[in-house]
Amino acid sequence: MLKRKVRYLLLIVVVFTGIILSVEAIMRFQLNKNVDYYLKFFDKHKDNIENMYDPLNIKQIPYSTIDQLYTKRQSEAEPIDWDKFAYVNYITDFEYLCNTLIQFRKLNDSGSKAKLLALVTDTLVNKSKENKEVEALLNKIKSVSDRVAVTEVGSVIQPNDHTPWSKSLTKLAIFNLTDYERIIYMDNDAIIHDKMDELFFLPSYVKFAAPISYWFVTADDLRTVSTDTKKLFKTNKLDPIEKKLASRVKNSLEIYNHLPNLPQHFYSKSMNFIIDIDGFQKSDNKVNFATHLMVIKPDVTMANDIRDNILPRYLKAKEEYDTDLINEELYNFKELIYYQFKIFRKIQYLFKPSVLILPYTKYGLLTKSIDDKRQKDLLKNAILGYERKEKDDLIQDAKFIHFSDYPLSKPWFYSNADDIQCSKKYSISDENCQLWKSLYKEYLESRAICQVN
């Protein structure tokens, strides 16, 4: 009798398990069909779709489109309230005060009308009361323009961390700057060649935009995504896409669905993560968002979540910094697409995308790329998977160039550009070498404004 009951219970368990697995299989099949349908739908019907956005891709926006959106906004009758927009630096150490002064002076001289906000840690502010040099540099920053504001913030320091990035989580204070409609955050170990006011006028639904970490892309990756793009869309030419986007901007039509996709190759081999996001690692993307320049719509809810939930976890973690937090917790490509599609399936016409990828040659160029033959092809175009007839002119076209030449030190540790030598192993040419060195020379010459008596 007992054996019969056991067999009966086992049979029930087997049948129940079979039903669950069958239901899951049907749901997976149906979800895969939905994914395939909408991938084709948005590609085929994008010219006729209004107020519905592709949830299955992360979009790249060309510089020409960014500039046209800004020109369009300037032509409108309603005046721009520049008090709602700010360029932002954060400063944790004395060595970085001069960099902020240089950047703010350049933005002011190039005609930017936005606010210039320096977030200075409380420890550095307190030091200014004793150190006349710190006080003098803070005063110089304030004197750049009446649009400059210096705000004190609390230091966020990784315990038992002695790396140069131990204070990098202080950067997360930028997400709480809710007095502003949109901010452009900039690491200040970078050189600015022109104002970037156009970035304030990305589509209103975009909460976060940044270049990507293009330096992880290999020559093989470039060939693969170029081929994949041709297969999917019959062409990988960017020029007709830019022309189409220009027409839509001019006619006040939605542009999102016409923007180039970030090739799927960079974040997943398949779209299966849409079915089960927990079964996929967040950190196995080939590229992520770079965080040395970010365009952000500050948000109270996100700021509170960072402060109350995310930051406490990261302060306990070892060697986890601002870039990790932003790409793993806030704007992970797989999770973005997973939740975008989840929302879209429930409320199609209410879904709006929240991120864009900025062209890295314009807003995210690293100095080391300028004279590194391994990255030469990467700098021909800033939209991955696509090609343009006219190539970007490296330094002349770049607005923001980040000093990153490990194992070389940051430029303020040198007194003369002649002390810095190009790589013998990876240098592209003498011309590129001189271009690269010219940035160090430009920076070192600009430090003259930081001298205090």
UniProtKB/Swiss-Prot annotation:
Stored Gene3D superfamilies: Spore Coat Polysaccharide Biosynthesis Protein SpsA, Chain A
Membrane topology of the entry: Single-pass type II membrane protein
Any one GO molecular-function label of the UniProt entry: transferase activity
Principal location class: Golgi
Cytoplasmic side: 1-8
Family: Belongs to the GNT1 family.
PANTHER family: GLYCOGENIN SUBFAMILY MEMBER
Name this polypeptide is given: Glucose N-acetyltransferase 1-B
